């Protein structure tokens, strides 16, 4: 596996979806963080739903952004920009502001690397990656703004989050979730067309 493929695998739904579910449970089960859990559900729903909608509009009805090489937001870019910085922030809730900022910065750097890998592997155009990354970062910022103070989280809870997250990533890394195939089937069903719309020119 080349480095770009290794990076892009870290942004696949096969890795991110189990991590999202685990973070949801980690936040919702304890009463004191339940509000945050529901905010997280909203953030994931808006991000994932926005990506899916942007792709379905293009695949089903050829609705895109005029003047851009665009077929919908890059899902890897958007979801990575939401999940990885958020994971870093949750893991460092007990740390001081400086360490939390460094951790979130590293999460954003990983998400940016995943986004760049999508361009390098010719999976998305530059516009799709930029728009997807900006969309995910915007939603991540909204979620982080409502995050409770660090002192409310126990060492045991953070250790549980870190350990299970690591196990999930190790178990799911390298797998590919058929999200694009699912969206194509949905686009065909809702449009009534025999084929979905696709990019006319190959990526440079």
List PLM regions with ranges.
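Terminal transmembrane helix and immediately flanking juxtamembrane interfaces
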Residues: 1-57, 93-103, 109, 113, ...
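Helix-loop junctions on the outward
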Residues: 55-68
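Histidine-centered catalytic micro-motifs
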Residues: 68-82, 121-132
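Internal transmembrane alpha-helix with an interfacial aromatic "cap," most often the third helix
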Residues: 83-97
């Amino acid at each position: 596996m080349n480095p770009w493929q290794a990076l892009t695998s870290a942004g696949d739904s096969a890795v991110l979806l189990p991590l999202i579910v685990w973070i949801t449970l980690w936040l919702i089960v304890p009463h004191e963080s339940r509000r945050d859990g529901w905010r997280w559900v909203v953030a994931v729903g808006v991000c994932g739903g926005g990506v899916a909608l942007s792709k379905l509009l293009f695949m089903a009805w050829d609705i895109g952004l005029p003047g851009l090489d665009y077929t919908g937001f890059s899902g890897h870019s958007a979801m990575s920009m939401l999940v990885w910085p958020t994971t870093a922030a949750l893991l460092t809730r007990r740390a001081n502001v400086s360490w939390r900022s460094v951790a979130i910065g590293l999460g954003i750097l990983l998400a940016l690397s995943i986004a760049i890998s999508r361009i390098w592997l010719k999976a998305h155009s530059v516009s799709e990656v930029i728009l997807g990354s900006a969309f995910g970062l915007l939603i991540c910022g909204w979620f982080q703004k409502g995050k409770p103070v660090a002192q409310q989280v126990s060492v045991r809870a953070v250790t549980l989050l870190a350990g299970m997250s690591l196990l999930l990533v190790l178990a799911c890394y390298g797998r590919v979730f058929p999200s694009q195939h699912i969206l194509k089937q949905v686009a065909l069903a809702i449009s009534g067309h025999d084929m979905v719309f696709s990019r006319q020119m190959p990526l440079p």
